[in-house]
Design a protein with these regions (language model features):
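Generic beta-sheet signal
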Residues: 3, 133, 140-146
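Short active-site segment of divalent metal-dependent hydrolases/proteases
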Residues: 11, 150-151
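Loop-to-helix element that buttresses phosphate recognition and phosphoryl-transfer chemistry
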Residues: 3, 7-61, 113-126
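Conserved beta-strand segments of alpha/beta enzyme cores
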Residues: 2, 70-72, 187
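Short, basic/glycine-rich phosphate-binding loops at helix/coil junctions
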Residues: 15-18, 81, 99-113
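Acidic, low-complexity terminal tails and accessory targeting/binding regions
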Residues: 74, 82-92, 135-141, 156-201
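Phosphate-coordination/substrate-recognition cap region in phosphate-metabolizing enzymes
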Residues: 38-100
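Active-site catalytic microenvironments for nucleophilic, acid-base chemistry
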Residues: 41, 64, 68, 132, ...
């Protein structure tokens, strides 16, 4: 089978560098444009099934790309829940929160954001969702629209990097990745391939 991975388009919260996971922000004008560019790119690509996170920013992106084709939403592939850090910028955090965040970024497998989702619970949730997608779509071409953290977990799972590789897979908005998956072999056609080539890329 072949898996295509897309991160949702830009939101105003992305533009402001805010922390958010389950906060249900929609994509902004730039995000809509990114999704439209991806829609045009995927018109040339055969897709049998489309899955999306149930959060608005991913689903809206998927709906634009799908261009009328059906989409199956999956809560399992939504982003990490940030707890009390949801909908905040670095500047809006207390000094104590900033210290904890720095610690979390170096020991994310063992530390949990205040009132948030434990990383390994998140990782297992997402990868179990990906396993279901693979199990139910053998031999098919599948598009998955999700979030940066969730997509990173998926790439970690596919490559065998595991949770320790979490920071090694940063999915850009307006780009896609494509992976051939079989029982014996994993082959990346591309990672962060632009929907539209722009000057300087």
């Amino acid at each position: 089978m072949k898996l295509y991975f897309v991160r949702h388009g830009e939101t105003d919260m992305n533009a402001r560098n805010m922390f958010y996971g389950w906060y249900d922000a929609d994509i902004n004008a730039k995000g809509i444009s990114q999704a439209e560019e991806l829609r045009d790119a995927f018109r040339e690509i055969h897709i049998d099934k489309i899955y999306s996170s149930d959060l608005k920013r991913a689903l809206h992106t998927a709906q634009i790309i799908a261009d009328g084709r059906p989409i199956e939403t999956m809560p399992e592939i939504r982003e990490l829940y940030y707890g009390k850090w949801e909908n905040r910028t670095w500047e809006e955090m207390t000094e104590e929160d900033r210290v904890v965040l720095k610690q979390w970024r170096t020991d994310w497998e063992n530390l949990t954001m205040p009132e948030g989702e434990a990383f390994l619970d998140f990782y297992n949730r997402v990868t179990e969702g990906l396993d279901r997608i693979i199990r139910e779509n053998k031999g098919k071409h599948v598009l998955v629209v999700s979030h940066n953290g969730a997509l990173s977990a998926m790439h970690c799972h596919l490559t065998g990097a595991g949770p320790k590789g979490f920071w090694n897979f940063n999915s850009k908005q307006g780009y896609y990745s494509a992976v051939w998956v079989s029982e014996k072999k994993l082959t990346y056609d591309c990672f962060n391939y632009p929907a539209v080539w722009k000057k300087g890329e």
